[in-house]
A protein has these predicted regions:
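Sec-dependent bacterial lipoprotein signal peptides
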Residues: 1-18
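Extracytoplasmic metal-acquisition and chelation regions
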Residues: 4-6, 20-312
Length: 312
């Protein structure tokens, strides 16, 4: 983060100059659409579905990036400052968002959509790897992947709906209607997950990175993660225990995520004759994803993958 902090001073100067050159009109006055930036993809998807034609939503993350190591450029920071709204999960879950807010705060509105979630609804980090030094953004002791739980995702979608109504009350009825359609889809996904996990051949899912804790908790299966929340690698003792467990249970699949690489997982997979299955953590899209992908479409693909891992 040192390089990121060093660039804040010139960024703030550029933002101030851009503000001075603005002839007194806001972006919203020049363009009726609400300009939105988000961190993880689900927030962008929800903003687009609720806001419809009245919003232009973008995610800050390039396709396929590992969000643990992403840092915005100076140009990115200026774009964020010119937006009407910046949506992120929370200061704890999105450390990069906190840095962006410190740099451009006062130029854009910021919505921490996951702040509505009660503390007792959050998952503590329970991975028992030895401590390792690693670069990037440390998510601390709480699992940030709240969006993978469709019930918690609905709470965040409602926060986005309320903020859009605040910014553009003339479209309130449209936002309410669009939110209700989205909420109905999220209820359906919750029910599909409940049904899929009601009676399974296995009770554990092996995955390359600790990211499905909320799904495991709500739908009553065990997550066995090879790398921790911040991609910290397992100790030799943990590694041996994981390999032994895979062989004892005759596990057939290890889930890989679309934007996270793990050489340790590759080694385990090849040494245990398990097959890789791609699980989409939804944090970012990749070049392989359809341009019209939504939270719902990706989660339904995940339901199929989880069903395969829990039943084959």
């Amino acid at each position: 983060m040192n390089n990121f902090l060093k660039m804040l001073t010139p960024v703030l100067l550029l933002i101030s100059l851009a503000a001075c050159s603005d002839e007194g009109g806001s972006r919203q006055e020049a363009d009726d659409n609400i300009e939105i930036y988000t961190t993880v993809f689900p927030l962008k998807s929800f903003a687009e579905q609720i806001g419809g034609d009245s919003v232009d939503a973008h995610t800050i993350y390039p396709k396929g990036v590992d969000v643990h190591t992403y840092e915005p450029t100076q140009k990115d920071m200026i774009d964020f400052a010119e937006a009407d709204l910046f949506i992120y999960t929370s200061d704890e879950f999105d450390p990069v968002a906190g840095s962006i807010k410190n740099a451009v705060g006062g130029h854009s509105e910021f919505l921490p959509a996951a702040d509505i979630i009660e503390k007792d609804g959050l998952m503590a980090h329970d991975h028992e790897h030895d401590e390792h030094e690693h670069e990037g953004h440390d998510h601390g002791s709480t699992d940030p992947h709240v969006w993978l739980d469709p019930v918690l995702a609905q709470s965040m979608a409602e926060q986005i709906k309320d903020k859009l109504i605040e910014l553009n009350p003339d479209e309130a009825s449209t936002y309410e209607e669009n939110y209700e359609a989205l909420a109905a889809d999220l209820v359906d996904i919750d029910e599909e997950l409940e049904q899929m996990t009601a009676d399974t051949a296995r009770d554990s899912v092996y995955i390359s990175h600790e990211s499905i804790g909320y799904l495991a908790d709500r739908y009553h299966f065990e997550q066995v993660a090879i790398n921790g929340l911040n991609n910290d690698e397992p100790s030799q003792q943990d590694l041996t225990r994981i390999v032994d467990s895979i062989e004892e249970q005759n596990i057939k699949y290890i889930l890989y995520e679309q934007n996270v690489t793990s050489s340790i997982t590759d080694t385990i997979q090849s040494s245990t004759d398990t097959e890789p299955l791609e699980f989409h953590n939804l944090a970012v899209l990749t070049d392989e994803d359809d341009e019209d992908s939504t939270y719902q479409s990706l989660m339904r693909e995940n339901i199929s993958i989880l069903g395969q891992a829990l039943n084959d």
